[in-house]
Amino acid sequence: MQNLFRLLPPVDAVLTALGDDVGLAALPRAMLRDAVTAYLDGLRDDIRAGRLTEPAQLDHGLVFAQCARQVAAATRPHFRRVINATGVVVHTNLGRSLLAPEAAAAAADACLRYSNLEFDLATGERGSRYSHVVDILRTLTGAEDALVVNNNAAAVMIVLETLAKGREVIVSRGQLVEIGGSFRIPEVMAKSGAVLREVGATNRTHLRDYENAVSPETAALLKVHTSNYRIVGFTKEVSLAELAELGARLGLPVIEDLGSGNLTDFAACGLPGEPTVQQAVAEGADVVTFSGDKVLGGPQAGIIVGKAKYIAAIRKNPLNRAMRIDKMTLAALEATLRLYRDPERARAVIPTLAMITASPEALAKKARKLAGLLRKALAGRYAVSAIPGASRVGGGAYPERDLPTTLVALRPLTGAPSPDALRQRLLAADPPLVARTQDDALLLDPRTLADDELKLVATVLAQACQPETA
């Protein structure tokens, strides 16, 4: 064992060897030294544990190469670009919606330069940051007023805290959803100070259930759109229009949490059934909350639209300061909303909308192109084919609806890594590629791949299929 320890190169020798790597040589010397020291300490631990037993395992050329890979991995940014080949458009774990070029440029400009964030250029006095998006939200949704906070859970919380703190909010038992990250509507309500008053059964709720539950303690009626699951079979749900009529008759505000938030009617794509924000406002909701970074295709934000008197009260809530959005988000959101003034252009240039509405013919063409690139790149190690498949919208929207697509399937030939092994290698690639496996094949969905990513996908796969070195 002592002889093995003597074979380890000194730190300075490794640093000299790594100096030939342009990428590593650009790192701060102290950072590089710390990373090399950590690597050599790991080798010492492996010797003590009996995991390294042969002198050949400590050949200096091998050690230098392994160290270079480990140092590169240890010093690269943790927050990284990922290639999404899953076909899930609004992938909540991979960053949700991609921004349109105009929105990304607006956010970058807001970062790099001063702006009129809270400055009224007409008067030269202090202004409101919300003024940049209020008018366009009014125009797009038909609402009297609007406010934006940092996400939809915050939007729901500040609405309830403002309108119902210490009082009851009536909601159907079948709408007490979990919104992700183990956060549930009842818990959000409890934090807001509102008192939950459940009515109806999980599968059936009638208008009379709401009306019978109203008391002097009632502050509001809440409808939560169950966008991330469906109850089917023997069911009954009160429509928003019915609830709005009841609220108006009893003098109670009606709040609708739309969750994903949709400004586009996707019926032409075979995705009917999701209410739009415009419909919710038209049907009489007093306050509507929804997300900015899901089906809407913008940055993370919680958007609140509705009657002016309620929005004014919410705007004055001190929580608004804690939940306010930053200048980059505002810039990106305004740019995204401005694109919606021309619905056809919005569908073409907002990536989320473009991916959802992509035609089966266009996807089949893209799949054939990708398959051709992969046949060349993988040199017979995998059988590559284009097969029918399904994509998902994601982001808690359209849980029962698949989008028809053409998948590229990779099935291993003799000696090639299995689909599961290849998938793991792709996660360690640079950039990482996320795909699915099914029926003994690795599946790539072109729906969530940009045209300029196809060659990169082929390159990443070719590198991932190389024999692993020690």
Swiss-Prot record:
It is found in: Cytoplasm. HAMAP family: SelA (MF_00423). GO terms for biological process: conversion of seryl-tRNAsec to selenocys-tRNAsec; selenocysteine incorporation. GO terms for cellular component: cytoplasm. Converts seryl-tRNA(Sec) to selenocysteinyl-tRNA(Sec) required for selenoprotein biosynthesis. It is an enzyme of class 2 (transferase). Gene3D superfamilies: 3.90.1150.180, Type I PLP-dependent aspartate aminotransferase-like (Major domain) (3.40.640.10). Belongs to the SelA family. One of its GO terms (molecular function) is L-seryl-tRNA(Sec) selenium transferase activity. This is L-seryl-tRNA(Sec) selenium transferase. It comes from the Bacteria. The lineage of its organism: Bacteria, Pseudomonadati, Thermodesulfobacteriota, Desulfovibrionia, Desulfovibrionales. Pfam families: Se-cys_synth_N, SelA. Pathway: Aminoacyl-tRNA biosynthesis; selenocysteinyl-tRNA(Sec) biosynthesis; selenocysteinyl-tRNA(Sec) from L-seryl-tRNA(Sec) (bacterial route): step 1/1. Its EC number is 2.9.1.1. The keyword S-adenosyl-L-methionine does not apply. The keyword Repeat does not apply.
